């Protein structure tokens, strides 16, 4: 929220105009997006790589056609894994839990299915990551080797959220590592999972 404030972007999605950027949420926090729903225009439910290009192409098309922000958000809600809070009526019980969750338009999905990348080797991954102009603490390439965890500890949200375990092909990882080192000038690789 501080980033929005510093960027002079209205904090509440309902207060944003056609001139304001879209505020999109994703990652682990989207498994319970309601506490932050008033601040976001839309959320990716699950892993964003699945619907990123479809959403981006829709955005470009609708901008070219002169469509409004609301019209875009309405159409975006039909992209698998996209949750647009402004298109749902949510009521709460006295204890703060959700009593009902209903779309306000008939063509908006009643439920949003989280999206999962099943083949990590085919998943989009930056071969030429942005390199900061200043000295960074993590002055190395970050290479994602897998998602998921075989343990599934009950206290660990990430271990449960990113199931099932999915690994990238070793040859593909070698190719990515070479390209990323060459394009960034870094000399070290941090393996991420």
Task: Kindly label every feature range from the protein language model.
Residues 65-66, 111-115, 166-167:
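Short, exposed beta-strand "edge-strand" segments with a Pro/Gly-rich flavor and a Y/T-containing core
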Residues 118-193:
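Radical SAM [4Fe-4S] cluster-binding motif and immediate context
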Residues 84-89, 93-140:
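Ferredoxin-type iron-sulfur electron-transfer modules and their immediate structural context
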Residues 18, 25, 34-37, 64, ...:
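Generic, low-specificity signal for short hydrophobic/alpha-helical stretches with a mild N-terminal bias
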Residues 1-103:
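Glycine-rich beta-alpha loop elements in corrinoid/cobalamin-binding modules
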Residues 7-12, 18, 105-112, 119-121, ...:
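Generic detector of short, locally flexible boundary/turn motifs and exposed helical patches
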Residues 15-17, 74-76, 115, 135, ...:
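A generic structural signal for short, solvent-exposed coil/turn residues
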């Amino acid at each position: 929220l501080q980033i929005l404030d510093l960027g002079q972007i209205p904090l509440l999605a309902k207060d944003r105009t056609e001139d304001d950027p879209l505020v999109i949420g994703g990652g682990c926090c989207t498994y319970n997006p309601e506490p932050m729903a008033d601040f976001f225009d839309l959320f990716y439910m699950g892993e964003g790589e699945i619907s990123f290009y479809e959403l981006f192409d829709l955005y470009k098309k609708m901008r070219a056609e002169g469509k409004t922000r609301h019209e875009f958000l309405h159409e975006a809600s039909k992209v698998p894994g996209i949750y647009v809070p402004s298109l749902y009526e949510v009521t709460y019980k006295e204890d703060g839990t959700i009593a009902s969750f209903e779309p306000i338009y008939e063509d908006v999905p009643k439920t949003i299915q989280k999206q999962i990348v099943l083949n990590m080797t085919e998943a989009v991954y930056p071969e030429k990551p942005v390199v900061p102009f200043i000295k960074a603490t993590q002055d190395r390439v970050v290479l994602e080797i897998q998602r998921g965890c075989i343990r599934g500890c009950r206290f660990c949200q990430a271990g449960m959220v990113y199931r099932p375990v999915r690994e990238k092909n070793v040859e593909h990882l070698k190719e990515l590592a070479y390209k990323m080192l060459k394009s960034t000038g870094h000399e070290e690789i941090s393996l991420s999972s």
